[in-house]
Amino acid sequence: MTRQLAIELSGRNIRVNSVAPGFIDAGMSAPIYEDKKVRKTRSEAVPLGRLGTARDIAEAIMFLDSEQGSYVNGHEFVVDGGVVHSLLNQLPRD
């Protein structure tokens, strides 16, 4: 959907991107991380070694909305501390 909208709206100088958050300790998910075992397990699953914050997500969005991000269009920004890429390494190779 993001890519298609980016294609359709780019002629109007409208950029469309999306942000896909990982394990974020904020808002509705905050109660989940009150459990110390869950917090530890999920933090250890993140290559950066910590849960994300609302600020991490906001910074990605601010970049996309800034002059520095003005040539980015049609992309999904995965803000997960590297989880997606680390999981790919765990898949069986045969």
Question: What spans do the regions from the language model cover?
Answer:
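Short-chain dehydrogenase/reductase
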Residues: 2-3, 58-61, 65
